[in-house]
Amino acid sequence: MRFNIDEWEPKTTIGRMVKEGQITDIDYILDNNLPILEPEIVDALLPDLEEKVLDVKLVQRMHKSGRRARFRATVVVGNRNGYVGVGKGKAKEVGPAIRKAIAQAKKNIIRVKRGCGSWECGCGTPHSIPYKGYGKCGSTAIEILPAPKGVGLVAGDVAKAVLGLAGIKDVWTKTFGETRTTYNFAMATFEALKSLNFTRTMEKHKEKLGIVEGRVL
């Protein structure tokens, strides 16, 4: 369903500022570490966001009244141009579980640092990543490494979905531990992308590596 900002009634200060046009760029929120507590904030500022359901599982737990079953969904959202988020949601039915996961993924949105860090390439365009990143979730870990143009996403399906929606076209990956848990694998990949933002780069190297944070116009 297409988002209509006129029908949105924001519940937070940031939400009201977005609706009133005082905040018009998602980067302002991310640069100032402002909390995104409403998924509609992302809907308003990143209207080209795509959603992909990675996994829906039936999970059961014992309760004093008997066995209770719920659905757990894992979702990734991204605009294929420098922004991505991962989330999970639980509910008694599939639809609400997916909607909860989408909402959480939007609230977890990050800006992705891209570039060309492969010594085999050196084209200076943001088709890959500028240097290696590492992420871990539970017993799952992943290392992402710069790759030359044309290699593609050398990764498992879950990591490929996260990297693709982030706007990365070429990358090598190494995985460690248990990769069969979809949510952990997706979150480990998400954390690896997030880790790229913690490395500072000198200005003279930024141009050489073609580093871009967020969208490429």
From Swiss-Prot:
InterPro entries: Ribosomal_Su5_D2-typ_SF (IPR020568), Ribosomal_uS5 (IPR000851), Ribosomal_uS5_arc (IPR047866), Ribosomal_uS5_C (IPR005324), Ribosomal_uS5_euk/arc (IPR005711), Ribosomal_uS5_N (IPR013810), Ribosomal_uS5_N_CS (IPR018192), Ribsml_uS5_D2-typ_fold_subgr (IPR014721). It holds the Pfam family Ribosomal_S5. The keyword Iron does not apply. GO terms for biological process: translation. GO terms for cellular component: cytosolic small ribosomal subunit. One of its GO terms (molecular function) is rRNA binding. Residues 49-112 form the S5 DRBM domain. Keywords: Ribonucleoprotein, Ribosomal protein, RNA-binding, rRNA-binding. PANTHER family: 40S RIBOSOMAL PROTEIN S2, RIBOSOMAL S SUBUNIT. Part of the 30S ribosomal subunit. Contacts protein S4. The N-terminal domain interacts with the head of the 30S subunit; the C-terminal domain interacts with the body and contacts protein S4. The interaction surface between S4 and S5 is involved in control of translational fidelity. Belongs to the universal ribosomal protein uS5 family. With S4 and S12 plays an important role in translational accuracy. This is Small ribosomal subunit protein uS5. It comes from Methanocaldococcus jannaschii (strain ATCC 43067 / DSM 2661 / JAL-1 / JCM 10045 / NBRC 100440) (Methanococcus jannaschii).
